Every structure is written in structure tokens, then in C-alpha cells.
Amino acid sequence: MITPLDFIADLFNPSLAFLPRALAAVLLASVVTGVVGCHVLMRGMVFIGDAVAHSVFPGLAVAFVLGGNLMVGGLAAGVVTAILVAIFSQNQRLREDSVIGIFFAASFALGIVIISLAPGYSGSVQDFLFGSIVGVSNEDITHAAIMGAVILLVLWLFHRQIVTVSLDRESARAMGLPVLALDIVLYVLVTISVVLGLQTLGNVLVLALLVIPASAARLACRRLGSMMVFSPVFGGLCSVVGLYLSWAFNLPTGGTIVLSMVAAFVLVWAVTAIRSRARAQLKN
């Protein structure tokens, strides 16, 4: 069995250069999705992570048929779909999750139609959708770091306004806030953060990083600011543990990281439940 010390030594082994790159990729994703996930959870649109992964398909299909860059094609399709969802969600008679489902289902269907016209598509497109964390390049890390910094900067600049819209849209409109523009900003940021992680981490791991750490933070913290600190730390620690376990026992990396997060979430849930019960007994 590979011990934690052996794992640390392997991280500095030049012949295993893919291992520290995989660790860097998952840690960067943990930080970005940890913060973005808090907004997603507060907004009640947990479904969006999986939906975005499907919405990129038309862009992937067009990029593949034309011989273009899959990342650029997927990102363009995801952003366009996100903007359309934000616009149509302004109708108060439509639930936001309903609009998400309609547009992202349509996007995926369109992608299937386009890609079916091109033979030999399965390999490269599947790599994008399901990820290859051990195949992360230095260029992938650089791109993720730059875009992650941009996402966090924009969220920091518009934090108060986005939170206000998420909590009470009518009050936000009464205050004169540009609700549509802020919706577009949030949707586009979520889309970019998900698409950036798809090619390296895959759909399942990105969705887990978007939802599980933020949910654990919601249980453990009372304030949004504390959640946005707890969530990335939770995701990062679980990712390190999951990567170690997958390396030590020769298990699938993405699945092991997800299971590590689920186990940690259950632990947080149990601890908070016990703590809440103890407080209730003290009050009585």
C-alpha cells in the first residue's frame, strides 16, 4: 500500500509529472466551484451544473465538424445558452429551473443532431465530456488559473448585487438594480467555471465540486461569507484525500474524489445534527 508519505514523495517525482498537475487542477477547480457553488445553492439552481455540461454539446459538435478547438466551441455554446436562460427567466410565470431544463435539453438535442453528421466523433468529444484528470497539461493549469481568477474577481466586484437579486428579485428591481444583467453575469460565470473543468475533471466530478462542498458549508455555517471560505477548503481537502486514495488503491480518480466528498458531507451532516440537538436540549 502507498502511504501518505509515499504519495507526497510521488508528487515530487519527475517521472510522475502528471500527478502534481492533476492535484493542481482539482485544487483550482475546488476553489472556483466552491465559491460559485455557494451562489448556485443560494439561488436554488443546483440542476445547472449538469445542465451546462449538456448545453456545451452543440458547440463541441460544430467545433469538431469544422476541426476547431473543442474548448472554445463548448464555451461559446454554454455562454449563449446561459444568456438565453437568463433572458427567458425574467418572465415571472416561468420557474427558473424550468427554463434551464428547456434550453439545456434543446442544446443537447441540437448537438446530437449536428454530431451525428460527422463520422468518427466519439473519442475526442467523449474525452471532453467525461474528462481525463491524469492527462492535464501545464497549459490546462495555466488557463484554469487565469480564468478562475477572473471568475472570482467578478464575483467579488458584484457580490452584494448578485446576493440581493438571489434573495429577493422584486426588492432588487425596486432598488434599481439591473436584474437581467446580474442574472447574465451569474449564469455566464457558472457556465465558464463548469466548462473549464469538464475537459480535465469530467461532468460528474465538476457537478460534485459545485454542489457537495457548498451544501456542506450550508450545514456548517450561518453566514454566506463563512460558507464561501468553508466550501473551497472542504472541496480542496476532499480532493486531496480522494486523489491519494485513488493513487494508493488504483481506483478511478474522479469517482474516488466524489465518494470522499460524499463521506465528508455525511460526517458534517452528522456533526451538525448532534450539535443542533445538544443546543436544543440545553435550551430546554
Describe each PLM feature range.
Residues 251-284:
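Cytosolic-side transmembrane-helix boundaries in multi-pass membrane proteins
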Residues 3-15, 120-136, 244-247:
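Membrane-interface helix termini and inter-helical loops of multi-pass transporters
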Residues 204-255:
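Transmembrane alpha-helical segments in multi-pass inner-membrane proteins
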Residues 1-31:
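Membrane-interfacial amphipathic/re-entrant helices at transmembrane-helix boundaries
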Residues 22, 70-78, 97-101, 144-145, ...:
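Loop-to-transmembrane alpha-helix initiation sites
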Residues 29, 141-213:
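Helix-loop-helix "hairpin" substructures at the membrane interface of multi-pass membrane proteins
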Residues 38-121, 217-229, 246-250, 272-274:
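Short loop segments and helix-boundary regions at transmembrane helix junctions
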Residues 17-26, 124-152:
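Loop-to-helix entry region at the N-terminal start of transmembrane alpha-helices
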